[in-house]
């Protein structure tokens, strides 16, 4: 009986190792080719952020202020990733998308749809929140090593600025 258990454990470990090996050698992350690809870390500079949070109907105590935010954008195979990290809020979300195609995800339990497009060298994203009957338009404009993200909901426009940082080396 113990040989059977040992064999099952070894088989399970081999399967896990094979799965890990396969994931690590899929399509490699591409960080170049589009101006907006890369790792972007927020600066202390923002404009009209609290008004934007209020227009969304979110509590300022939780979402107001200038929390350090990291946006990582990369291409992997035929799709892109947009990973958003807010460390002091223990928040991390990875959105996979194809340019021009609508996708779905949840943000803190609320269903949202999104559609990323490219206009010239700039990335655009339209986020719809059906339960709140709200639409957010995001624009990502790169100027040198700085990314200016503009958020718009109704007549409220907010901006935050990000600096480009070195991305992690690919694990593939």
From Swiss-Prot:
The keyword Glycoprotein applies. One of its GO terms (cellular component) is extracellular region. GO terms for molecular function: lipid binding. Disruption phenotype: Affects slightly survival under dry conditions but does not affect survival under frozen conditions. Residues 30-59 are annotated as: SAHS-c1. Its main location: secreted. Residues 115-164 are annotated as: SAHS-c3. Residues 74-102 are annotated as: SAHS-c2. The keyword Metal-binding does not apply. It is found in: Secreted. Keywords: Glycoprotein, Secreted, Signal, Stress response. It comes from the Eukaryota. Residues 1-19 form the signal peptide. Glycans are attached at residues 108, 133. Induction: Expression is highly induced during desiccation. Trehalose, a disaccharide essential for several organisms to survive drying, is detected at low levels or not at all in some tardigrade species, indicating that tardigrades possess potentially novel mechanisms for surviving desiccation involving tardigrade-specific intrinsically disordered proteins (TDPs). Belongs to the Secretory-abundant heat soluble protein (SAHS) family. SAHS-c1, SAHS-c2 and SAHS-c3 are 3 highly conserved regions within the SAHS protein family. Secreted heat soluble protein acting as a molecular shield in water-deficient condition. Tardigrade-specific intrinsically disordered proteins (TDPs) are essential for desiccation tolerance by forming non-crystalline amorphous solids upon desiccation, and this vitrified state mirrors their protective capabilities. This is Secretory-abundant heat soluble protein 64681.
């Amino acid at each position: 009986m113990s040989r059977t258990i040992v064999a099952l454990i070894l088989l399970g470990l081999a399967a896990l190792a094979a799965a890990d090996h396969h994931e690590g050698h899929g399509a490699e992350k591409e960080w170049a080719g589009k101006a907006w690809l890369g790792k972007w870390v927020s600066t202390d500079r923002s404009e009209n952020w609290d008004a934007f949070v209020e227009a969304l109907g979110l509590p300022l105590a939780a979402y107001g202020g200038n929390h350090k935010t990291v946006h990582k954008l990369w291409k992997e195979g035929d799709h892109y990733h947009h990973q958003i990290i807010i460390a002091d809020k223990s928040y991390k979300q990875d959105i996979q998308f194809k340019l021009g195609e609508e996708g779905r995800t949840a943000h803190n339990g609320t269903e949202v749809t999104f559609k990323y497009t490219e206009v010239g060298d700039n990335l655009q994203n339209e986020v719809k929140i059906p339960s709140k009957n709200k639409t957010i338009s995001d624009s990502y404009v790169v100027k040198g090593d700085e990314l200016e993200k503009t958020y718009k909901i109704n007549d409220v426009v907010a901006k935050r600025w990000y600096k480009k940082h070195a991305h992690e080396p690919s694990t593939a």
